[in-house]
């Protein structure tokens, strides 16, 4: 009992710097060794920064590309509906571990005020508060959270997934911030091929830490779809700020940024692209991605 208490205190009190999405269908669930179920794993959580393409793509730097979910397990995407995942700093603080006994409304398993925010001085990050909690969220408050996204590729074999066939299909503003996050699915998203699709959870924080990015692997399946539409070939995104006329219209690739190679977007110093209108991504389901 004492050992369990010490472990939980250690996990909850650590100064985490990162967040990932936890749900069925994820790669590296329980760690990067499919033979071992580590319920306290955070290996999928670490960000991607200044890495060669061969390492950042699909989290190959930690072997997550080689740790798929069990056969037949998918993240279900209901066409025209919504799906919910858990954003957390460690699998321990989700319902995928310990029967959900360590979950709260927050990604770190802690308890925070509903209007949790950083101080109104300097950059004002959550981690600038006494105690330094909240650094994982890279934000001042919920409103300033940069937004997260999901992309889909209609390639059942992940070896065939590329930037030019991986299309962002939904975004969620003001995330990551709370544990539960619900994303909208375009109604015209077509069914996946036999063996399912590849999906990626995506995030580029806006300040409050290292200028990194996130790409997390999933096997996914579009459910309830009778659509015969096809997804367009995505274009690289462009940072457009407040001038929407400069934004890329239609299907867009994920943001590949601040890596040694493989980047598809460049910004001025201090400018952060994100899965939001400043980089051409509308809020919610991306209904303009079809041919």
Curated annotation (Swiss-Prot):
Its cofactor is Cu(2+). It holds the Pfam family LPMO_AA14. Disulfide bonds join 192-197, 199-220, 240-247. Keywords: Copper, Disulfide bond, Glycoprotein, Metal-binding, Monooxygenase, Oxidoreductase, Secreted, Signal. Optimum pH is 6.0. It is found in: Secreted. InterPro entries: LPMO_AA14. The keyword Cell division does not apply. GO terms for molecular function: metal ion binding; monooxygenase activity. GO terms for cellular component: extracellular region. Residues 1-17 form the signal peptide. Binds 1 copper ion per subunit. The keyword Oxidoreductase applies. Optimum temperature is 40.0 degrees Celsius. Its EC number is 1.14.99.-. Belongs to the polysaccharide monooxygenase AA14 family. This is AA14 family lytic polysaccharide monooxygenase.
